[in-house]
From Swiss-Prot:
Gene Ontology terms describing biological process: regulation of DNA-templated transcription
Lineage, top ranks: Bacteria, Pseudomonadati, Pseudomonadota, Gammaproteobacteria, Lysobacterales
Keywords tagged on the record: Cytoplasm, DNA-binding, Transcription, Transcription regulation
UniProt name for this protein: Probable transcriptional regulatory protein PXO_01555
Keyword Transcription: yes
InterPro entries: Integrase-like_N, TACO1_YebC-like_2nd/3rd_dom, TACO1_YebC_N, Transcrip_reg_TACO1-like, Transcrip_reg_TACO1-like_dom3, YebC-like
Provenance organism: Xanthomonas oryzae pv. oryzae (strain PXO99A)
Any Pfam family: TACO1_YebC_N
Amino acid sequence: MGRGPSIEGRKNASDAKRGKMFTKIIREISVAARAGGGDPSNNPRLRTAMDKGLSANMSKDVIERAIKKSTGELEGVEYEEVRYEGYAPGGVAVIVDCLTDNRVRTVADVRHAFSKCGGNMGTEGSVAFMFKRLGVLSFAAGIDEDTLTDAAIDAGADDVVVYPEDGAIDVLTAPDAFAQVRDALAAAGLEPAHAEIAFRADNDIVVDGDTAVQVRKLLDMLEDLDDVQDVYSNVDQAALGA
């Protein structure tokens, strides 16, 4: 009987995944600080990125260095934001948000992923109209639904979505109300497990069989690219076994 992966092998894989996640967060911190300054109290995007880093057990020293490199206190790489749109197999719409120091490399990598998995890149705006940009504050099961709903609506949230399959709750806001709602909920002792401004599809597409396999392959391949920060699609995640 063959042996499974060694403990060392699993650890190396875990370390690599953690390192890639840290790289993405550091880039987000860098771009946020460069765009809005290094003070998180006056820069909601930076605060969100810093919170993401701290939640991932990133040290404060690493976060501070990333901020200083972005504000010019230390030498660092300058990243720019680029967005690509396209279609996966089955007509699934895909948005790919990137932070890069080399657009030529990034677009080549993204185009290769689409092509390899049977999809195709589109022009700007070709699929974005199928999504809305929202603030999303996600709470794990166990939090009191009525308390959270009342606090969220009072704080200016647009909607509260409860997922009966696992009891999780999402509070949805307009992007410009995201920081206000997050701060109000935190002041009420309601801290989300995850908070971000993201794209949400207006309607999901169900795929199955080989199409589902190819869609999953494309999304995974895109997410594994170093320059890619976020990947959004309108596929029904249940159809992918997610």
